[in-house]
Regions:
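A conserved beta-strand element that flanks and buttresses the S-adenosyl-L-methionine
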Residues: 22
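Conserved Class I S-adenosyl-L-methionine
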Residues: 90-152
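Short conserved loop adjoining the S-adenosyl-L-methionine
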Residues: 9-16, 31
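A short glycine-rich, Lys/Arg-flanked "PGG" loop and its adjoining helix->strand segment in the class I
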Residues: 34-49
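A short His-aromatic
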Residues: 25-30
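Short alpha-helix
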Residues: 68-91
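Conserved SAM-binding strand-loop segment of SAM-dependent methyltransferases
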Residues: 1-11
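Short, glycine-/aromatic-enriched active-site segment of Class I SAM-dependent methyltransferases
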Residues: 49-70
Length: 152
């Protein structure tokens, strides 16, 4: 079992070599992705992201601000990695087939909670899920969710 390190990624520099570093829907929440990548770049030669990305220039500012997100175009993400000599070696899009079942799953589970259990964060999650369901076609035009593998 691996030890857990409690740290802000912006302040963390690993002292171990890793086969792979994995970001699951978290890269978009980094304040400074360049700093984080610089911190971890000497500890791995492979980084995998499952990440939201912009597909259009219609930036959903109010939505992403509620979640403290920075959603980049894939070419911007690639440039962050390119600065550290990482190349995109694999890309697979998921949102077209995963958005609707994911939203339905969240809504079904949120419906099981009573009003006392619905904290402000849970209320925001529910509001977001309903927004995504009602605006699915627009969301799918503007935002993607992909697995991106970067290697050097």
């Amino acid at each position: 079992i691996f030890p857990v390190v409690l740290s802000d990624l912006h302040d963390y520099t690993p002292d171990t070599l890793y086969d792979v570093c994995l970001f699951v829907e978290s890269f978009c929440h980094l304040k400074s992705p360049r700093k984080v990548l610089s911190n971890i770049s000497e500890s791995t030669n492979k980084i995998i992201l499952r990440e939201y990305h912009m597909k259009s220039n219609e930036h959903p500012k109010k939505y992403v601000d509620n979640w403290l997100m920075n959603i980049y175009h894939i070419d911007e993400i690639c440039s962050f990695f390119g600065e550290l000599d990482f190349k995109l070696t694999y890309e697979e899009e998921h949102y077209e087939y995963s958005l609707e079942p994911t939203v339905e799953y969240w809504l079904q589970n949120l419906d099981k909670l009573d009003s006392i259990e619905k904290t402000k964060h849970i209320q925001l999650l529910e509001l977001s899920a309903r927004y995504l369901k009602q605006n699915k076609d627009q969301i799918l035009r503007d935002i993607g969710l992909a697995t991106l593998v970067f290697e050097r």
